[in-house]
Design a protein with these regions (language model features):
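Conserved active-site and cofactor/substrate-binding residues in soluble primary-metabolism enzymes
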Residues: 42-46, 69-73, 85, 102, ...
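Conserved small-residue
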Residues: 51, 71, 78, 107, ...
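Residue-level signal for alpha-helix termini/capping positions
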Residues: 56, 83, 152, 193-196, ...
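Acyl-CoA/ACP chain-elongation machinery
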Residues: 86-132, 165-179, 207-217, 233-246
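Conserved active-site "lid/cap" helical segment
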Residues: 1-2, 6, 13-14, 187-199
């Protein structure tokens, strides 16, 4: 749509869903900006563009959203670009700033949030028998990815090696997984195949781990299907236990 503030239909989305505080905040920010800054500031793709300007990257700047998997998707795109020979290095960044009162209310209505507000050690305990939900969080993180050859050539301190990537979509429900866990099972198997690894080579799984009965049940089903009886002795947790859910 046009950028001008006198665009006749500028309130159409706002009027269609007045319960969404996001549109109200967007309008408030837009009113405070100079007219020429509105498009650049609110355009989704400008996030990657500004990072490219800041750090001088020359690869394709991509801004994406795959909800909770956005950071992992950014890493996968970087890995695949390096594999294709499009670049030696890739900057993959994940960021989230969606902790609002409305988000807290909606997740609370789903009984998805931990109520251990006064005892943080008991909050957000993925797969624990006494878990009661996750802690909503905000934050960002960045990884510099590069080919192993490039890293060794410059004497880099290598923190980890990405052996494989994989993903699948679950079209069953917005917040619930398919009952047979087939998309999650396929995703794990896709990663193993891409990495050229067997199930027996995996020693730890960092799961989605929302500390909710629905998530824990489906992740256990998918992992036990892929790894069999080994899942009983294999460490499984989630970084949500330390930094919350972004």
């Amino acid at each position: 749509p046009p950028v001008e503030l006198d665009w006749a239909d500028r309130f159409s989305l706002y009027n269609s869903d007045k319960k969404d505080g996001g549109s109200e905040r967007l309008l408030r920010v837009a009113r405070a900006l100079k007219e020429l800054d509105i498009f650049e500031t609110t355009q989704f793709g400008s996030i990657a563009d500004r990072l490219a300007d800041r750090f001088g990257t020359r690869g394709l700047p991509i801004t994406l959203s795959t909800a909770c998997a956005s950071g992992a998707t950014a890493i996968q795109l970087g890995v695949e670009a390096i594999r294709r020979g499009e670049c030696d290095k890739a900057l993959s960044i994940g960021a989230d700033g969606s902790a609002t009162a409305e988000a807290l209310i909606r997740f609370s209505l789903l009984s998805a949030l931990s109520t251990h507000n006064d005892i943080p050690e008991k909050a957000s305990k993925p797969f624990s028998k006494d878990r009661d939900g996750f802690v909503l969080a905000e934050g960002s993180g960045a990884l510099v990815l590069e080919s192993l050859e490039a890293a060794l050539a410059r004497g880099a301190t290598i923190l980890g090696i990405m052996r494989g990537c994989g993903e699948k979509a679950d079209d069953f429900h917005r917040t619930r997984s398919k009952p047979d866990a087939s998309p999650a099972i396929a995703a794990v198997r896709a990663v193993l195949a891409d990495a050229g690894m067997s199930e027996d080579e995996i020693e730890y799984v960092n799961a989605h781990g929302t500390s909710t009965p629905e998530n824990d049940k489906m992740e256990h089903l998918s992992l036990s299907t892929v790894f069999g009886e080994r899942i009983g002795s294999m460490p499984v947790s989630s970084n949500k236990s330390m930094i919350g859910h972004t």
